[in-house]
């Protein structure tokens, strides 16, 4: 379990750096409520982006992006509503992205950013 938590935290760090280098601003990380946790919340222009990060070392359990099930999507939407209410800020546009990371297949991690994933 600790190994999975460390892998997940490493993946979130990689994703945050990747998104920042792509011009996004990280607004919040690991925001929690009774519904669970949002990995990253970022701003890109007038978009507020809720980002689910999935990190894998292999494809034994499927690709990282495939791990974002309908149930997980629904939970992230609930979290987004709570975050928006609690933040007190208004965003004209909101979207949900997935950053899928494969580690251990070559010298560099493979990062796939799926915009507006759900």
From Swiss-Prot:
Q: Name one GO molecular function term.
A: nucleic acid binding
Q: Extract the SUPFAM superfamilies matched here.
A: Restriction endonuclease-like (SSF52980)
Q: Which Gene3D superfamilies match?
A: 3.40.1350.10
| Similarity-based family | Belongs to the UPF0102 family.
Listed HAMAP family: UPF0102
Its protein name is: UPF0102 protein RHA1_ro06551
């Amino acid at each position: 379990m600790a190994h999975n938590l460390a892998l997940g935290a490493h993946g979130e760090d990689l994703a945050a750096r990747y998104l920042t280098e792509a011009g996004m601003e990280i607004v919040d990380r690991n925001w929690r409520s009774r519904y669970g946790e949002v990995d990253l919340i970022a701003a890109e222009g007038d978009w507020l982006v809720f980002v689910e990060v999935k990190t894998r070392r292999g494809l034994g359990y499927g690709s990282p992006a495939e791990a974002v099930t309908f149930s997980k999507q629904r939970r992230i939407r609930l979290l987004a509503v709570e975050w928006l209410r609690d933040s007190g800020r208004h965003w004209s546009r909101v979207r949900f992205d997935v950053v899928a990371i494969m580690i251990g297949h070559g010298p560099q991690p493979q990062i796939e950013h799926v915009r507006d994933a759900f």
